[in-house]
């Protein structure tokens, strides 16, 4: 009888053969791919609603995007379904990756990694939502109305959906700033004091990264920078608070050990 595939995290002390590791990897890849295919199938089934969501940021005076050629309606709908499927299945994919690499972490590293991994899908969805509800509408309005007296503007569906979904994905990735900073602080790579001291360079890096997003106008650039800077500042506050709590816990533990040693020590002769 074939062995039951593993779907649980392996303990740090557990030792597996190469074949066992490959079987574990295969199972988790199948689960991740299955989740992606299921979510993409649902998005394909509800493709009309998906396209309505994508088209909503367009200004009212702009007609619906157009397609060219016989196959483009099919391929555009297929790519939209894949993008939405990836977004919906991301928590499952991240968990499968985390569960596979978890045995390589020591117990101390696992205490750092577990809460940070749990933050990733929520921050990603937060970035996507911020982009959709705050950034996309002013961005499309500005870009489509710019010098519009000189152009007969028509939007190609494939280009527009790629623009929207790429911008949303980029903002979702950009919202991972707290994960990167907290991980660096917890692993001793940097400190809150160094982050505060080099704040100006961090803001410059954020501005450069935001400039590479598909929305190239200055107004949208500011809209994209503001939450990233706030997340950077929040990360400094959180990392400082965590460091302070850990320092207090270490001090209490040292005091408890010292008190226990005093109790065990024999009484001095009178």
Give the label of every model feature segment.
Residues 1-270:
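Membrane topogenic/interface segments and analogous intrinsically disordered interaction regions
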